[in-house]
């Protein structure tokens, strides 16, 4: 069992928290807003377009910018699994024009509450993330003897100089963890919490 710290309590952070809890880890979610998943409430004009009822391949064909970025994610968790997850959490779904999937209730809040249920078992702490806590790695040991023929010497690729061991909160408190996952979103909607904290980290 690992101590997992997830920075950001939006849709991605709550999904990650639920998955980590199910793998038996101790999970803490750091969320700087009063209410986790707040941006979910404004998606799909307040209805939340959960996914599209299509294959992963069809989905990727409609991604205009850098679809390759989503290959592994959609390969592991295609739209059908997303629908299955929410239906398993008690959300009744419907498919509308353009194969868009919405909750029958037409309320994004239902999706937010479902994700909170999925993340049950994780501790949600209301604090922001100010900095990553880094621990220097010991330098790699040099080989005992250099090869006689310099043509056979392979240039070493530089590795990471440090590893992340936690986060310093805006409150001044430090949160230590074995694994740190940054799921802060971008700068799309600052009033809902998307304030670019991940970029600054």
Question: What are the residue ranges of the model-derived segments?
Answer:
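Glycine-rich FAD pyrophosphate-binding loop
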Residues: 21-45
